[in-house]
């Protein structure tokens, strides 16, 4: 799951990449955050260094947003990475066909979480976090850092809790 300051890689910053991974019988998370705008490429490098041990990527709408955004940033920084060696599962793409059957207003991750009764601890939207990140870069604070990490952690946790919906997929 990525957090960015906008929807277009050309004019926005990728400031946080969060991953869940399964090891020794349980789920763990890792979060890679750019503490300044200049560290963006370092976060991407650290992500690919971490991901090279894995072959599968599970994401929520990553085919349409996360993966293209990261690849555009790789181009921008002339980084030699791609997702060609990975197999992926886009939870959004797999669940969206059931939107009307489930009587959902949309297939946003937070909507699916509410449908499943999953509680989030974070109170900010991704859009609200943009300002919090810009404030954090100028004047780092524990509040801002915690808000940024918590939102991403809840997104990751939510994806893991949405995964069982795929057991009904044909």
PLM feature spans:
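Conserved RNase H-like, two-metal-ion catalytic cores of nucleic-acid enzymes
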Residues: 1-53
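Metal-dependent phosphoesterase core characteristic of DEDDh/y 3'-5' exonuclease domains
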Residues: 12-15, 24, 28, 62-162
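Acidic catalytic cores of enzymes that act on phosphate-bearing nucleotides/polynucleotides
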Residues: 160, 164-170
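Short His-Asn-centered micro-motif
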Residues: 2, 59-62
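Secondary-structure boundary motif
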Residues: 49-53, 76-79, 168
């Amino acid at each position: 799951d990525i957090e960015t300051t906008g929807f277009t890689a050309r004019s926005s910053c990728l400031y946080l990449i969060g991953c869940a991974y399964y090891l020794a019988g349980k789920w763990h998370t890792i979060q890679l955050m750019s503490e300044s705008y200049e560290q963006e490429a370092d976060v991407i490098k650290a992500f690919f260094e971490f991901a090279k041990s894995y072959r599968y990527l599970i994401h929520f709408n990553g085919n349409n947003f996360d993966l293209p955004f990261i690849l555009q940033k790789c181009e921008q920084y002339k980084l030699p990475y791609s997702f060609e060696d990975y197999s992926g599962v886009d939870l959004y793409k797999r669940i969206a066909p059931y939107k009307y059957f489930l009587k959902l207003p949309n297939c946003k991750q937070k909507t699916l979480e509410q449908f499943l009764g999953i509680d989030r601890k974070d109170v900010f939207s991704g859009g609200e976090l943009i300002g919090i990140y810009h404030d954090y870069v100028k004047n780092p604070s524990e509040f801002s850092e915690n808000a940024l990490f918590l939102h991403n952690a809840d997104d990751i946790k939510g994806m893991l809790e949405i995964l069982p919906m795929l057991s009904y997929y044909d």
